Amino acid sequence: MAVAAALTGLQAEAKCSICLDYLSDPVTIECGHNFCRSCIQQSWLDLQELFPCPVCRHQCQEGHFRSNTQLGRMIEIAKLLQSTKSNKRKQEETTLCEKHNQPLSVFCKEDLMVLCPLCTQPPDHQGHHVRPIEKAAIHYRKRFCSYIQPLKKQLADLQKLISTQSKKPLELREMVENQRQELSSEFEHLNQFLDREQQAVLSRLAEEEKDNQQKLSANITAFSNYSATLKSQLSKVVELSELSELELLSQIKIFYESENESSPSIFSIHLKRDGCSFPPQYSALQRIIKKFKVEIILDPETAHPNLIVSEDKKRVRFTKRKQKVPGFPKRFTVKPVVLGFPYFHSGRHFWEIEVGDKSEWAIGICKDSLPTKARRPSSAQQECWRIELQDDGYHAPGAFPTPLLLEVKARAIGIFLDYEMGEISFYNMAEKSHICTFTDTFTGPLRPYFYVGPDSQPLRICTGTVCE
C-alpha cells in the first residue's frame, strides 16, 4: 500500500503543472518549480518585465530557467514504472463480484457499473444496455482521450489569461500615473488662469480705489472752499447788519450779486461689484477641447458663388463679385453658405470658429441633405442646428427664435457635438462660457455649417487649441 502511494506521488511529481502530462525537456525556474521547456516558454511568451510562476505566482525577474537533466532521467524511470504498474494491473483486473462470486465481465451503460453475468438478470438491470468490459473500456478510453486536448487548450488559455491578468496591476499603475499627470497639468493651467484673473481683478480694484480717492479729495476741497465762502458771507452779513439804513440798503445789491455760489454735491463712494470671470464650465470645456478637438476644413464644392474659400480651406469671406465656379449639385446658390468636412456619423467632436468683428453670421451643423436652393434652413430646426448674429443680436433660430444673452462679445465660438446623445452645444470662447445646447435625435451624416453673411470680414476655422 505504501509502495503504491509512493508510486502515485512520484507519478504526480513527474508531470507538468501546465499541460498535466509527463515533463518533456524539463526546466527549473527561479522559485524551484519544474515545467516542460515549451510550456513555460509559451506561458511567458508575451511578458517583458515580470514573469510569474504558474504554480506559486512568484515573480521571476528576468524569465530565466535552467535545464534539469537529472529530473529528465527520473521522468523516464517514472514512465517505466507506470508501464509496469499498468501491465500488473491488467493481470490483477480479474476481480470477482462480491454478490455472486463471479468474474466482473460486463459494463452497464445506464448505471455506469461493472457487473458479472448474473447481475444482469432481472430485475436490477432489466432492459439496460450492457457490453463486455473490453469494448466498454475502449469506448470510454477514447472518450477520455478526446477530452485531453480540449482540457489542455482550456488550461493553456487559462494560464495565458492568468499571465495577462498578472500584468494588469502594472497597467493600472501606468493608467493612474497618466491620469494623475493629466489632472496635475489641468489644475496647473487652472491655477495659472486663476492667478491671472486674481491679478486683473485686484488691479481693477486698485484703479477704482485710486479714482474714488481722487474724487473724494476733490469733493473735500470743494466743501472746504464752500466753507470759506460761507465764513466770508457771515462776516459780511454781520458787518452789514451794523450799518446805518442808507449804507445798508446801498450795499444790498452788491452783496447779492457777489454771493451766489451754490453748495457742491456730496460725493458717494461707489465700487463696482467686480468678480472673476472664471466660468464653472472652464475645466470641463478644457477637457472637451483636449480630448475631442477635430480638424475641420471647408468644402469649396458647396460654397456659394459669392464666397471665396482660402487655399488651405480654413478661411472664407464674402465678395460682391460672383465667382465663375462649376455648378455642383450641392453648391448653395441663394444664401452665402458653405459646408465643411468631415461628415459626422457618430462620436463626440469639438471645433472652434473665429467670427471676429463680423456683423452677421450663423454657424452650427446640418444634415447632408440640407436643401441648397432654400433661402434659409428649416425654421423648425429639423435639418440645421445653429446660432446666429443678426441685427446686433444673438439668436437660436427655430420655429420660435430664441434670443441669446452674451455678457461678452463673441469673437470665437466653440462647437461640441455628441452624436449619440443627440446634443450640439455652443460656447463663447472669449470667456469659455456655455451659450446654449440643442437636443434632438440625429440620423444620417451631419456636416459643419457656415453662413458667412454679406460683409467682407472672414470666418476662420481655428487650428490650434484656441484661435490666435
Swiss-Prot record:
Coiled-coil parts of chain: 170-222
Any one of the GO CC terms: cytoplasm
Gene Ontology molecular function: ubiquitin protein ligase activity; zinc ion binding
Zinc finger (RING-type): 16-57
Residue intervals of the B30.2/SPRY domain: 276-468
Short name of one Pfam family: SPRY
Name the UniProt record assigns to this protein: Tripartite motif-containing protein 75
Organism listed in the record: Homo sapiens (Human)
